[in-house]
Amino acid sequence: MVSIRPDEISSILKQQIADYDKSVSVSNVGTVLQIGDGIARVYGLEKVMAGELVEFEDGTEGIALNLEDDNVGVVLMGEALGVQEGSTVKATGKIASVPVGEAMLGRVVNPLGQQIDGKGEIATTDTRLIESIAPGIIKRKSVHEPMQTGITSIDAMIPIGRGQRELIIGDRQTGKTAIAIDTIINQKGQDVVCVYVAVGQKQASVANVVEVLKEKGALDYTIIVNAGASEAAALQYLAPYTGAAIAEHFMYQGKATLVIYDDLTKQAQAYRQMSLLLRRPLGREAYPGDVFYCHSRLLERAAKLSDAMGAGSMTSLPIIETQAGDVSAYIPTNVISITDGQIFLSSDLFNSGLRPAINVGISVSRVGGAAQTKAIKKIAGTLKLELAQFDELAAFSQFASDLDEATQKQLGRGKRLRELLKQPQFDPLNLAEQVAIVYAGVKGLIDEVPEEKVVNFARELRDYLKTNKADFLKNVLSEKVLSEASESMLKDAISEVKSSMLAA
């Protein structure tokens, strides 16, 4: 028979009483009622806030977007294969945030800031909220520094300033991404941090962009945020805000940053998908009523900060894809009204061989003029007007049989200007080279050069300046003005190249 030892029992009880933990944990918990199409309906979660992160049993995260009387609509950030009806959901009390900092440079991340390039974890402890309020009026300064794209037609006629929002708009396959990538490549040595946000793109296209940037030595100062076409709609919707948050970190440290959103059409479509699945009321083109706010709160985060705030800047280049050149559709008109100008790419110009295929007539920069350097402003003033007049004359001349000499001369110059502005992909020009090329065209110094040789002339002029007139390049780049001495050097170079071409 087992003997009972009261002393041992009492010592065990005393030990357990001594070890008793009085702390009580209270968590806001709910239950999944319904799951499908990346949306979960959750019962409970009474104290959850709009936009709050919630966590499912299997570790999947979601965002509470719809707060209804009897349930909460949650969008899932991931596949959520382990989430089922009856699973428990816990409110985290946090809003989505991403890692930020120098360690992100040269990396490819997803919209949650997790690495997807296989180079190991990102060693940074700094984080920033994905959604944050844009700087107010007092914290800003007017745009006054140029953001050189390296594309002559943009820097001469549609100049972009640091802190500006310039829309790149056009049909598919018209070179929108090419302009954005050229701009990133042109920031080499300028101490500008670039963020490229790919939304709904093919993985092969993003891999190609990474490869080009690596080849050109531009990946060292670039961060790529990728939400591919196969990702959940919630991640495609979040990606641009993640890119803005990463750039903001550097902006508030006093650095210049450039963010490219490629493209916001796909983000709007992802947001529409989420909203329709959440049973939100729909508006024009089935987009929800707050799709304008979705884009405006993103693009308002671009700013040129005041000196008191560190004088940093964030320049945004959102991309919008149009259908058959229709810029009056809902999303294009929304983003045009939010941004400080647009670069319109035409498929007709692209197919006719003019690349970059910029339609100068309807492209505009509303604030960039104040940021344009004096050197190019001085000579490019008449360029846009001449090209606009050429377009009118070219249309008119199709119906006219005999044209007077002045009209023929103007048409000839317009054609040569068009040829001069042609530029191969991934070959940005510096300021001095742009000044030289625009000067040659506007001053009529290449009117005798045959039209088919103009592209070669531009290339040879660049090579000649690099080898024989290095002082010209150095002076213009350092002084940012075209002095009389530089102008005479340029005239000599143009006449040398022209005479050697005409003699050949």
From Swiss-Prot:
Q: How does it sit in the membrane?
A: Peripheral membrane protein
Record keywords: ATP synthesis, ATP-binding, CF(1), Hydrogen ion transport, Ion transport, Membrane, Nucleotide-binding, Thylakoid, Translocase, Transport
Where does the chain bind ATP? Answer: G170, D171, R172, Q173, T174, G175, K176, T177
Where is this protein primarily located? membrane
Domain of life (superkingdom): Bacteria
Gene Ontology CC, one term: proton-transporting ATP synthase complex
Q: Which family does it belong to?
A: Belongs to the ATPase alpha/beta chains family.
Q: Under which name does UniProt file this protein?
A: ATP synthase subunit alpha
The gene it comes from is atpA
